[in-house]
Amino acid sequence: MNIMEIEKTNRMNALFEFYAALLTDKQMNYIELYYADDYSLAEIADEFGVSRQAVYDNIKRTEKILETYEMKLHMYSDYVVRSEIFDDMIAHYPHDEYLQEKISILTSIDNRE
């Protein structure tokens, strides 16, 4: 796997974490198997009794759907920005217990399921 493929896989996994609840069961299954579990198109096709082309088409459509959700809702990009701000605040104010506690609370809100 080259760097571009790894970056795409990481992005799809991140978008999936944020938007999985908005997908159909089939879309969730295919994306999770393909990106998170590293199944091949053939393995997914065998698992669901469909053609490789059907799996490929569904995955490509779902990738576009996930990107569209992100373009409209910005949940992932906002999370990344918040995380960077929190990291910066922690680095600049390591002895401020009140601030550390509030950052911890905000981080736990971001990471809840």
From Swiss-Prot:
InterPro entries: RNA_pol_sigma_r3/r4-like, UPF0122, UPF0122_fam_protein, WH-like_DNA-bd_sf. Transmembrane segments: none annotated. Might take part in the signal recognition particle (SRP) pathway. This is inferred from the conservation of its genetic proximity to ftsY/ffh. May be a regulatory protein. NCBIfam families: PRK00118.1-1, PRK00118.1-4, PRK00118.1-6, YlxM. Belongs to the UPF0122 family. This is UPF0122 protein SpyM3_0842. It comes from Streptococcus pyogenes serotype M3 (strain ATCC BAA-595 / MGAS315).
